[in-house]
Amino acid sequence: EAMNQGIPVVTWDSDIPTSRRITHVGTNWAQLGDKLAEAAFKASGGKGKAAMVGLVGASHMEAAFANFRAWMEANAPDMEVLPVFDDEAVVAKAHSVTAALIQKHPDVAVIAGFDGSSGGGICPAVREAGKSGTIKVVMNDILPAHMECLKEGTAQYIVGQKRHIFGPIALQTLYDINHSGISFTERD
């Protein structure tokens, strides 16, 4: 609606492609799925079951899940990708679904956490199961809890985003549009 009134719109962090926004500043979630798959492959030695924990239903997460699965199918013939475990982007839920996942699949080789809440729940669940270092953990977002998991050896890889620059770049873009005479058309 803002665009219909001539107000420029820029999205950041989570995109809304159908919004007619001028641009989006943020992570390419499909590429993030590739990076997490590659990290999971390396951490596990390319063998065993791989699990994904993240926010089911969000378009950006679904793109990451799809690319994770596609990367594994193309590059990891000795790995089985399990269905996604929904953590609802809540640390406590990530913990409970990971605990249930470990009980159901005690032979899981690697767990990949896709949202910022995933790792904070995955690591304690792996630790509590006595599987630190046995079950490999890879995750998204450079957060203090995730760094602690990496330092203690519960996690093996973190794929980082530069989230701290998304907002400033989006705001600078809007400022430039409003103060430099730059204009955009439907084709831009």
What label would you give each PLM region?
Residues 1-188:
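A residue-level marker of the well-folded mature domains of exported/periplasmic proteins
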